[in-house]
Amino acid sequence: MILDICEVPFIPAKLLRQTLIEGFKISDDHSLIAFKVDIGNMERVTAGFKDMTTGKVLKTKLTNVGDIIFGCGRTVFYTECDADSNRPYKVVRYDVRTGDSQTIFMDDNPTHYVDIGITKDKKYIVINSNTKEDSEVWVTERTESLQETLPRKLITRVKDV
């Protein structure tokens, strides 16, 4: 079994029946799974991790998560959602081993929504900041090095496109 939500330490037993599994991501070496759950069906997503080599769910949790993807090794990148509007507005790099996190991108404009993805060759993480009328694209290398994860702008925002 990939995940038994009864084993997730941060889900209260009384909310198990109302908890939705939102999705999974698997690390390149298949040793770690990142999963997202909506605890109590509140439309607020929490991410957790399972070590597939030991079969144990880690106690680590990330709150107000939008997208989550693996970098290299045990590093993940995720979008964090605003507590009031649930709008994904920043990208955080998180090291599952150490618990260290760093915000690498933030868009404070309340009309912009941020999402992330990986290029097909798995070399870069793509950061999109979108509205219904415009967008801009940033990229960062998919690496464990903290210095190399600062994004650079690939496509500048153009209004009314």
What are these regions, as identified by a protein language model?
Residues 1-161:
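Beta-propeller folds
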